[in-house]
């Protein structure tokens, strides 16, 4: 019997995302060391930190303070022999106290917003979801909003450059999961409609029988919506790895194979090829 054994230098390093025991922490400018100490004490390997840059309008515009905090936690984590990854939103963006603020996404960039076919924008206030506080503005942005996407990918590169081990992208979806939006098959904003026309020659506002899976044009809309977020996640990883070749990109996708995958436009079977791991929330 002949056994082929690997030589000492031939070991393949296992992907750390495959065997982590994670803990989640809110990251501030001053608590990086405390996070690392607590993670060690509780046998955490794989520290998730909440310090969302693109999903909060203030830091989307000015990320310096949060980037410094991410850099500190990455350094402390590595000194302890651990790994850390940071949460960012997909297409959602919240402006704190928008009812009193001079600037918000809606006030500054209403054309960026996802929309129903009726034109209603994806804008929500306190009570629409548990994480949206009274006075805050919560919006969902079209991934085809070119100026937004350019800044978003710049923020991804800046985050990756901190040395953090991973980026956790929360639900990169079309807005079809809040009350009143489930059957909209959004988005019908100008950016998205133009991209669909360029891809298929069809007018999304007039050529589709929404919800009718026997309609060939609607099926093209379904495929287009899924391809959109597959390409979005691919671009996130490409941008992150330009500055940090070993960084991991991990989207959170709660649908599996059920109908919600088609509605929100995130198909895990398409995404596996363009990300490093997928987090499921059930």
Segments (PLM) and residue ranges:
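Aromatic-lined substrate-binding rim segments of carbohydrate-active enzymes
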Residues: 50-90, 94-95, 104-105, 240
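Active-site beta-loop-alpha junctions enriched in small/polar residues
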Residues: 25-27, 52-54, 89-91, 172-174, ...
């Amino acid at each position: 019997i002949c056994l082929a054994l690997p030589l000492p230098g031939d070991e393949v390093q296992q992907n750390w995302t495959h065997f982590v025991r994670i803990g989640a922490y809110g990251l501030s400018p001053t608590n990086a060391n405390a996070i690392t100490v607590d993670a060690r004490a509780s046998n955490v390997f794989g520290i998730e930190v909440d310090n969302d840059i693109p999903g909060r309008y203030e830091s989307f515009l000015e990320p310096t303070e949060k980037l410094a905090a991410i850099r500190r936690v990455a350094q402390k984590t590595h000194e302890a022999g651990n790994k850390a990854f940071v949460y960012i939103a997909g297409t959602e963006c919240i402006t704190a106290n928008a009812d009193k603020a001079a600037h918000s996404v809606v006030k500054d960039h209403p054309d960026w917003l996802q929309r129903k076919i009726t034109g209603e924008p994806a804008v929500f206030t306190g009570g629409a979801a548990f994480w949206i506080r009274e006075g805050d503005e919560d919006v969902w942005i079209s991934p085809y909003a070119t100026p937004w996407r350019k800044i978003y990918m710049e923020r991804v590169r800046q985050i990756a450059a901190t040395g953090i081990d991973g980026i956790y992208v929360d639900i990169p979806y079309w807005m079809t999961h809040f009350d009143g939006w489930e059957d909209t098959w959004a988005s019908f904003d100008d950016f998205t409609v133009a991209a669909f026309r360029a891809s298929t020659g069809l007018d999304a506002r007039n050529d589709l029988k929404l919800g009718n899976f026997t309609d060939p044009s609607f099926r093209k809309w379904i495929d287009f919506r899924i391809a959109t977020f597959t390409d979005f996640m691919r671009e996130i990883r490409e941008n992150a790895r330009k500055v940090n070749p070993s960084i991991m990109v991990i989207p959170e996708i709660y649908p599996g194979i059920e109908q919600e995958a088609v509605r929100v436009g995130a198909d895990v079977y398409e995404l596996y090829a363009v990300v490093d791991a997928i987090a499921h929330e059930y």
